[in-house]
Structure formats: structure tokens, C-alpha cells
């Protein structure tokens, strides 16, 4: 099932990169993220691409965001033109929401059952984003981003007429 996620994300990225490239060569303009996200939704409803429904929609949309960032960076002169992703260089996919970590298992939307992983440290705070990557050698890694809550302490200030409490981080 993980291979389906990696393959689907790579397919979406490459498919829409090819469309953008072709569009730009013909009209000197290309569609943006929002137009391509609408097209992706319509594409998933067709018989030929119904297999994309098996993958979390936000994961596929994140691939489009990644492509949008690559395009913007290219046109701002920060990097070279976006390249097609291949199987042999590994890959990654992001799960921006609705995943859970319970013990040493990760639960991803539309993924049957949890995925066991070796936890190097406890995940503290509110879960924000998760990226699963694979190396060309076949090793899998997961990076979980969590927002920790700041520690607050009360500081009291006394004046002759009143007492005031302030919170500091």
C-alpha cells in the first residue's frame, strides 16, 4: 500500500508537470495550483483515473503544492526548471492532516491498518504534518512535525495600589 502512495504522488506530480510544460510552450502561460487541484478532482471522477481515489486527497494536493513551489522558485530565478520524478531516486509523500500516532504505529487516512515504526523519541505536542520518504535502497523514514505548547509562567508585579499578574513564555 505504501508503494501505491509513492506511485500516485509521483504520477500526479509528473502528469501535471507535463501539462504545465506543454501549456507554457504553447501559450507562454501555465495553470496555477488552484486550477490544477480542480482538474485533479475531475480526473479522479473518471474511470481511467479512479484508482487515485484510494489515496488521501490531501496527499495528492500536497504534490501539486510541491509542483507550484518548484515553478514559482524557477520563475523567480532561485532554482532550475522542475524535473520529473523517477522511481529510482526514492520519493516522499506528505500527510498534512488526519493522521494519528499511537504507540509505535502510525495511522494514515485511507490506509488499511497502522504502520509500525521504530520511534526514536516521543512525539509531544499537536501533530501538524507527516512526511514519509523512501531511499533508493528501500529504507523508509517518517518525519513528524508537531507544534509544542509554550511553557507559561506567571510573573507578579506589585505596586502600592494593585497587584498584576502577567504571563511570560
Residue map of PLM features:
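Nucleic-acid substrate recognition interfaces
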Residues: 1-169
Amino acid at each position: 500500500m505504501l508503494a501505491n502512495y509513492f506511485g500516485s504522488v509521483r504520477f500526479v506530480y509528473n502528469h501535471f508537470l507535463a501539462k504545465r510544460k506543454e501549456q507554457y510552450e504553447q501559450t507562454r502561460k501555465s495553470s496555477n495550483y488552484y486550477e490544477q487541484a480542480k482538474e485533479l478532482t475531475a480526473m479522479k471522477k473518471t474511470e481511467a483515473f479512479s484508482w487515485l481515489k484510494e489515496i488521501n486527497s490531501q496527499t495528492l494536493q500536497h504534490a501539486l503544492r510541491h509542483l507550484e513551489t518548484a515553478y514559482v522558485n524557477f520563475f523567480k530565478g532561485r532554482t532550475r526548471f522542475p524535473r520529473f520524478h523517477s522511481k529510482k531516486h526514492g520519493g516522499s509523500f506528505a500527510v498534512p492532516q488526519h493522521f494519528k500516532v499511537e504507540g509505535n504505529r502510525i495511522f494514515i487516512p485511507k490506509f488499511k491498518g497502522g504502520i509500525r515504526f521504530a520511534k526514536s523519541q516521543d512525539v509531544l505536542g499537536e501533530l501538524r504534518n507527516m512526511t514519509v520518504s523512501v531511499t533508493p535502497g528501500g529504507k523508509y523514514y517518517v518525519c513528524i512535525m508537531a507544534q509544542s505548547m509554550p511553557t507559561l509562567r506567571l510573573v507578579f508585579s506589585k505596586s502600592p495600589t494593585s497587584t498584576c499578574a502577567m504571563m511570560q513564555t
